[in-house]
Structures are given as structure tokens and as C-alpha cells.
């Protein structure tokens, strides 16, 4: 256990043999795996929303962490470099500016990040891992 979630999840996957199994999937099985993981995320999000509605602090924390575990675990099992993906997204997000996005109400008056003119979305080129097995 550490403060490096990506490394911890990778270690857990190695311990249980998850990545070795997923690496052998053909495109159809890989697509099935991705659908399974997206359903898993939906279930965790629903549980977390229910915890918020119930003011259940314990389950809110657990649910938020579970969402991170499933999302990071999916990247890991797909052979995607999560550190690189994170850095690319963070770099792009830090180019955004505080402003007002009219189509997104902000009743809490928190700083809202908007894309300035010329903003470029992050590219994950060369970091698609096993997703390259899928055809568009």
C-alpha cells in the first residue's frame, strides 16, 4: 500500500493475474470486457449517488474510491500508461481559464473552467494499449 494508486492497482492485477488474462483477449472479448467495466463503473456511480442521497459519509468515500479503482484498473488492464494519460489531461486542463459556461449552471459560485479560444484537447496518441485491437 502506498500513495501511488496506479502502482498499487497494477500490483493487485499482477497478484490476481488479471492483466495476463486480458492481454490474451481477441477484439470481441476485449469489447465485452470494456462493456463489463463500463457497467461496473455505472453500478459504482449509482451506489455513490444513493449514498449522497442518504447522507452516508462512509459509503460516499467508499464509492468515490471504488470509482477510481475501477477506472484506473481498466486503464491498467488495457496496458495504457495511466501516468502519461494523466499528465496529458492535466496539462490541457491547466490551459483552461476561469470563466462562466452559460449552459452549465453554477449555483455554488465555484471557479468554473472554460476552454479558451485555441484550446486543444489532449491527445492520447501512442498510448492506447490494447484498445488498438478494436476496429472503428
Report the location of each language-model feature.
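Flexible "arm" and connector segments at domain edges
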Residues: 1-64, 68-136
Amino acid at each position: 500500500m502506498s500513495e501511488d494508486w496506479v502502482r498499487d492497482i497494477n500490483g493487485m492485477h499482477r497478484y490476481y493475474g488479471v492483466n495476463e488474462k486480458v492481454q490474451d483477449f481477441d477484439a470481441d472479448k476485449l469489447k465485452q470486457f470494456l462493456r463489463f467495466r463500463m457497467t461496473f463503473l455505472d453500478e459504482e456511480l449509482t451506489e455513490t449517488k444513493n449514498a449522497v442521497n442518504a447522507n452516508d459519509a462512509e459509503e460516499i468515500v467508499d464509492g468515490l474510491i471504488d470509482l477510481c479503482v475501477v477506472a484506473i484498473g481498466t486503464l491498467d488492464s488495457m496496458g495504457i500508461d495511466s501516468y502519461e494519460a494523466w499528465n496529458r489531461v492535466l496539462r490541457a486542463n491547466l490551459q483552461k481559464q476561469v470563466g462562466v459556461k452559460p449552459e452549465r449552471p453554477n449555483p455554488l459560485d465555484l471557479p468554473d473552467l472554460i476552454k479558451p479560444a485555441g484550446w486543444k484537447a489532449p491527445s492520447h496518441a501512442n498510448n492506447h494499449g490494447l484498445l488498438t485491437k478494436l476496429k472503428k
